[in-house]
Amino acid sequence: MSARLAAIVLAAGKGTRMRSTLPKVLHPLAGSTILERVLAALGELALAECFIVVGQGAELVRGRIARPGVQFVEQTEQRGTGHAVQQVIPHLEGFEGEVLVLNGDAPLLRPSTVAHLVEKHRSFAADATILAARIADPGGYGRVFLDADGRVRQVIEDRDCTEEQRRNDLINGGVYCFRWPALMTVLPALSADNDQGELYLPDALPMLTHVRAVAVEDPQEIFGINDRLQLSQASRILNERTLVGLMLSGVTIVDPLRVTIDETVEIEPDVVIEPETHLRGATRIAGGCRIGPGTLLEDTVVGAGTEILYSVLRRSRVGAHSTIGPYSHLRPGADVGSHCRVGNYVEIKNATIGDHTNAAHLSYVGDASVGERVNFGAGTIVVNYDGKHKHRTEIGDGVRTGANSCLVAPLKLGDGVTVAAGSTVTEDVPCGLVIARSRQVVKPDWKAPYERTEDG
């Protein structure tokens, strides 16, 4: 598309119904934020300029959204959508192209829908083209009124409609494409003569000569978020889109109503996702895996043929054909190799685990480098913290630890070392067997003091 296109995203609203200290547009949604999802809807367009009008929490919005090609314009006093667009006028001086205006709280828009609106606007040679939809319950939305030729005659906010006007089910989707020189001529004439005393952008439409409407195919796309309930509804819609796309691409999702997956997650065909599984962020899962039930993966990479159930993995990596869980916890920096077993109540943090290594139950491995074909006995603990500093442990290939062993860092165990059960190892062991425990003492005639007679 021509680069003579600019976009204005309206993100200055107070969002009072969210009842939050966080700006509404920064609330998390499907792996990003509401505002980032709106910006993603502009992805198919070549924009000359992109402006975000900010108000409430402006610095927070700038901090999260700052990126090349995006400019922030502050609306210090929130006096309506028309007033918000007026704040951009000095930044588009001399601009002769088209301007898209869209709300920053409408995260369900598809890029193809926005691109289609621009294409239709150009084919109409209109002064303005708006996105509209017919919905069963139009309450809360501005109504679009057409003339006999199908052109937009007027858009009236819901609160300003009469009872008869509210029966109109054609609603304003809050997405506009304007010929900027035409809009510039009428913006100063906007009036605050309405119930809220605000300057409404739709009030500019009757002042323009040629205004058209384009119907959106999926009315859900123009869904706006004003409170936590609507945020949850938008989340459910986006999750359904993601799950449908994955299932059509060859992923089995056993119960879609009990699975959530961010659209940023990548899953290859022939993966089975069990119920109560939640996949977040930059997670990538290779083919042939079984994930869940009862599993959370965040920013985690999983190799082919691996099984993970009833476990939590964050910013971790698991190689191919390994088994994780049940009830394992892989914390950031965990890097588990191929053909490994990480079992019941095992926690791994900031540690690399070599191929064919097993930690089957009740172990903690933190800040460690572990070789291949290592076997951790039940209850093996890598003691990495001295109360002030973390220290590393290096464990060579083929090491075996007995049950209830403690490896106190900093420590190095050479290839093939065996640690006897119950040992607390505090010094490096280059090879062989290490036994580091108190000698067992048996007193067969011992009695508790309260059981002893006076004769002893």
Curated annotation (Swiss-Prot):
Amino acids binding acetyl-CoA: 378, 384-385, 421, 437
Region (Pyrophosphorylase): 1-228
Active site: 361
Main subcellular location of this protein, as a coarse class: cytoplasm
Reaction(s) catalysed by this chain's protein: alpha-D-glucosamine 1-phosphate + acetyl-CoA = N-acetyl-alpha-D-glucosamine 1-phosphate + CoA + H(+); N-acetyl-alpha-D-glucosamine 1-phosphate + UTP + H(+) = UDP-N-acetyl-alpha-D-glucosamine + diphosphate
Chain residues that bind UDP-N-acetyl-alpha-D-glucosamine: 10-13, 24, 75, 80-81, 142, 157, 172, 226, 331, 349, 364, 375
Annotated keywords: Acyltransferase, Cell shape, Cell wall biogenesis/degradation, Cytoplasm, Magnesium, Metal-binding, Multifunctional enzyme, Nucleotidyltransferase, Peptidoglycan synthesis, Repeat, Transferase
Subcellular location, record wording: Cytoplasm
Region of interest called N-acetyltransferase, as start-end residue ranges on this chain: 250-456
GO molecular function list: glucosamine-1-phosphate N-acetyltransferase activity; magnesium ion binding; structural constituent of carboxysome shell; UDP-N-acetylglucosamine diphosphorylase activity
Homology family: In the N-terminal section; belongs to the N-acetylglucosamine-1-phosphate uridyltransferase family. In the C-terminal section; belongs to the transferase hexapeptide repeat family.
Oligomeric form and interacting partners: Homotrimer.
Cofactor note: Binds 1 Mg(2+) ion per subunit.
Record's GO cellular component terms: carboxysome; cytoplasm; membrane
A Pfam match: Hexapep
Official protein name in the record: Bifunctional protein GlmU
Cofactor(s) named in the record: Mg(2+)
Function: Catalyzes the last two sequential reactions in the de novo biosynthetic pathway for UDP-N-acetylglucosamine (UDP-GlcNAc). The C-terminal domain catalyzes the transfer of acetyl group from acetyl coenzyme A to glucosamine-1-phosphate (GlcN-1-P) to produce N-acetylglucosamine-1-phosphate (GlcNAc-1-P), which is converted into UDP-GlcNAc by the transfer of uridine 5-monophosphate (from uridine 5-triphosphate), a reaction catalyzed by the N-terminal domain.
Known pathway: Nucleotide-sugar biosynthesis; UDP-N-acetyl-alpha-D-glucosamine biosynthesis; N-acetyl-alpha-D-glucosamine 1-phosphate from alpha-D-glucosamine 6-phosphate (route II): step 2/2; Nucleotide-sugar biosynthesis; UDP-N-acetyl-alpha-D-glucosamine biosynthesis; UDP-N-acetyl-alpha-D-glucosamine from N-acetyl-alpha-D-glucosamine 1-phosphate: step 1/1; Bacterial outer membrane biogenesis; LPS lipid A biosynthesis
Alphabetical GO biological process terms: cell morphogenesis; cell wall organization; lipid A biosynthetic process; peptidoglycan biosynthetic process; regulation of cell shape; UDP-N-acetylglucosamine biosynthetic process
Domain of life: Bacteria
E.C. numbers: 2.7.7.23, 2.3.1.157
